[in-house]
């Protein structure tokens, strides 16, 4: 009997990607985040679609349309809370996924890694334009501050900023186009995810040891489908707990006030998942320098594969690199904390030191640690 799963043109692709895919037998729970990110994306697209049915992208009605969704639409409050907190879960999984890639040397699959970095940037852009849509105080001022950074670009900056705004300031035209961007970008993300998986399946998954796993592979289904289902249960538990018990704990109280261009909030800050980059931006007194540092903080991921000096792929057996990795993690948490603090001492100096350490770790210390570990292994022979 012909197995349709293995012969049908469309089902064959799904079969080779999610069912009969040969996977390393030793991949740990750190490999769950890819599937969780896929689920987060589906949740965000579905909840976003239902929100878009009731939302109006006009400065006069945007804020009240969000209030209308929460008050009058059937389960609108739940859809909105799932969408807002789903973004936080998305970024939590993203950061853990990228961290896993750095720790276990997955960045040596260069094509997969580069598409992943482009995905990270696209998701960040989507989240930024999405945060503007409720048209609260922090939405408006966040959009004003961040888009205004474009004016720091020499010669074309001011023209570029006004072109993005569709006027001389953030206004109705900006909100309308941001809604259009926020609607289309998730579908672009979906296309990039397919390319990401395409490149991944060219090489196969990495594994914790960093050793070629071809000699010992198992089918993805049922082993890893069950494992991913467990991860999904945890994700839904956390997401539903957030959305149902404390839906506003990760938001900003200022966003409960409608946007007022005449009243600046005392402390403008983005959502928590941008705070590390925002802290790096603020740590440089020069506007253009800050913008370049902000870009570099993300784009530095693209050069990580070229800074790999160790003979071993994974950090599993490299204690010096492990120590530096966890210092980097602590440093990013520190930057996230600093990004949410007012611009005053001692936060300024802490932010500057943490920013310097961030770049020093990735560009200097980690490559040196790899070389040192090579030397120590050679010395043992």
From Swiss-Prot:
One of its GO terms (cellular component) is mitochondrial inner membrane. Signal peptide: none annotated. A ubiquinone binds at residue 201. It holds the Pfam family Cytochrom_B_C. One of its GO terms (molecular function) is metal ion binding. Its cofactor is heme b. Heme b b566 binds at residues 97, 196. The keyword Transmembrane applies. Heme 1 (or BL or b562) is low-potential and absorbs at about 562 nm, and heme 2 (or BH or b566) is high-potential and absorbs at about 566 nm. Belongs to the cytochrome b family. This is Cytochrome b. The lineage of its organism: Eukaryota, Metazoa, Chordata, Craniata, Vertebrata.
């Amino acid at each position: 009997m012909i197995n349709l799963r293995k012969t049908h043109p469309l089902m064959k692709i799904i079969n080779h990607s999610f069912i009969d895919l040969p996977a390393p037998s030793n991949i740990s729970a750190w490999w769950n985040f890819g599937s969780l990110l896929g689920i987060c994306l589906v949740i965000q697209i579905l909840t976003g679609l239902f929100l878009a049915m009731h939302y109006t992208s006009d400065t006069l009605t945007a804020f009240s349309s969000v209030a209308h969704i929460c008050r009058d639409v059937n389960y609108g409050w739940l859809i909105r809370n799932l969408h807002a907190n789903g973004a936080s879960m998305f970024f939590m999984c993203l950061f853990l996924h990228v961290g896993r890639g750095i720790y276990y040397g997955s960045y040596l699959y260069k094509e997969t890694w580069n598409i992943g970095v482009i995905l990270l940037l696209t998701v960040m852009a989507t989240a930024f334009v999405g945060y503007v849509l409720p048209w609260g105080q922090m939405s408006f001022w966040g959009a004003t501050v961040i888009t205004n950074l474009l004016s720091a670009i020499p010669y074309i900056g001011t023209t570029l900023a006004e072109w993005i705004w569709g006027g001389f300031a953030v206004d109705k035209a900006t909100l309308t186009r941001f809604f259009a961007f926020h609607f289309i970008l998730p579908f672009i993300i979906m296309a990039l995810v397919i390319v990401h998986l395409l490149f991944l399946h060219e090489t196969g998954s990495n594994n914790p040891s960093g050793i070629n796993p071809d000699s010992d592979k198992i089918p993805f289904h049922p082993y890893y489908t069950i494992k991913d289902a467990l991860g999904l249960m945890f994700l839904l538990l956390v997401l539903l707990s957030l959305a149902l018990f404390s839906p506003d704990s990760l938001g900003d109280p200022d966003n409960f006030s409608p946007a007022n261009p005449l009243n600046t909030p005392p402390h403008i800050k983005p959502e928590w998942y941008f705070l590390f980059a925002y802290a790096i931006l603020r740590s440089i007194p020069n506007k253009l320098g800050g913008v370049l540092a902000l870009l570099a903080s993300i784009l530095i991921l693209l050069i990580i594969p070229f800074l790999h000096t160790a003979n071993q792929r994974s950090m599993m057996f490299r204690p010096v690199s492990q120590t530096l990795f966890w210092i980097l993690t602590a440093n990013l948490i520190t930057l996230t904390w600093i990004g949410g603090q007012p611009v005053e001492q001692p936060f300024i100096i802490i932010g500057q030191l943490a920013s310097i350490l961030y770049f020093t770790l990735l560009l200097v210390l980690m490559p040196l640690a790899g070389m040192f570990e090579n030397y120590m292994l050679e010395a043992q022979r």
